[in-house]
Amino acid sequence: MLMLCAFIWGTAFVAQSAGSGMGAYSFLAGRSWLAVLVLIPTVFAFDAVRKKQGQPYGWPKEKPERKTLLAAGLVCGTFLFAASAAQQIGITINPSTAKAAFLTAMYVVLVPVFGLFLGRKGSAQLWVSMVIAVAGLYMLCMKNGFGGIETSDWILLSCAVLFSFQIMSIDHFSPLVDGVRLSLIQFIVVAVESSAAALIFETPTLAEYGANFLPVVYCGVMSSGAGYTLQILGQKELNPAIASLIMCLESVFSALGGWLLLGQNLSMRESAGCALIFAAVVLSQLPFAELRRCKKSA
């Protein structure tokens, strides 16, 4: 599920770069309202399936449960708004999707680091996987090095910090609430906050949305509506550090999408970067701890 999420996000980088000609908040507002429109029927569809299977469905009836769901949507939505806005602003200033993909994916390191402050101790296996993933990300995305740290780079690094908070918020709330409803409320929050920011700081026009119709639709329906819902559902029973590792595959899928769909050739360095990231994800999933326990009990 998170692998599919990474694929959708990876291909969305091209769409975001194509939409960098319009205001960052306007772009985010458009894609978020589209996500809301997609998620409303999705909630009803999930309810219908659950009803058929005899499982609990519908909105929470108890006040504490409703409060938890609303709090979850507000917290996750606010972090997602801030992270997505920072990402789009960074891409608008410097449309280098490669650098944006690398700097954004630094959440792969930040999530386990922040987890230490919450008492989550990562295994040596996990930390080795992180180092391999960062090396792979650098080889894949940074063909000519950093070329000096620019303003857009600091904005994209702040985006990685904010995405780390969003991932950890999802980790906290997803076992407590319905995932699809959390996704819906999260995007209502993002849509309202980004619309307010667009009206204050920008001048959105219908002509602007018409000129960027396809990027907004793809990011709204696929990246926001589908991708972030898959993230919530996929993270439900997974260590957030491992989840962040799997999701950093978005950089690999971004490069592979360009190769397959746009005819952009992958160099040996980029191919090696893809292989390292994939190896890091596989390494993080290998059950070394279980094998050691089995050997001890044998």
PLM regions: where:
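Specific transmembrane alpha-helical segments of multi-pass solute transporters/efflux pumps
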Residues: A12, D47-K52, Y57-L103, M139, ...
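Helix-helix packing/entry segments at the starts of transmembrane helices
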Residues: A6, G30, A100-M106, I170-A191, ...
